[in-house]
Amino acid sequence: MLNLFLPLKYIIVPVLFFLPINIKSEGKMIYDFNVDSSFRNWAIVDDGVMGGLSAGNLGIQKDGSGLFYGYVSLDNYGGFTSVRFRKNVSLKGFDKIILRVLGDNKFYQLRIRSSYQDRHSYVKSFYAADEWSDIEIPLSSMEPQFRGRSLRMKNFNGNSLVELGLLIGNKVEESFALKIDHIRLK
């Protein structure tokens, strides 16, 4: 007698292979840029707070991605610009931040704060290549800094964050442009 029923594994595996995978659904979204994005909780912080002349901007591209762009100046002892996003985010069950970015072959910093009372941030540098990439940053690899100086404290081990930022400050005068699709936890 001919067996017309295939084992289930021979049916499910090929079907799963052709299902669309939405990488954005993996983990917890912190911010997903799109054409309707609001920048209500975003702020630009330049070296102008100390007399510098750098200028950063945040905008939305036609494709819906965010664009952090501008110019870093070393005049008047400056040399950085940043964009910051304020939101209380629980990190329970997650140990990485994923940045989906398209860069300009420059180094940037991801910066987080776990409390509004903290003067320091936890920082991790990353290289943004000129192609879309998922930058995966373990939270435990983020080191404490204050005004660019390392602190003698433990790396990040918090349960939440209240602020997330991107900063460029490579000690050279330069234009920059970093496209951001989304920021999520994994």
Regions found by a protein language model. Give the residues of each.
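Hydrophobic h-region of N-terminal signal peptides that target proteins for export
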Residues: 14-22
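Beta-rich carbohydrate-recognition modules and glycan-binding surfaces
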Residues: 2, 22-186
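Bacterial N-terminal signal peptides that target proteins for export
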Residues: 1-12
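N-terminal processing/targeting junctions
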Residues: 13-14, 39
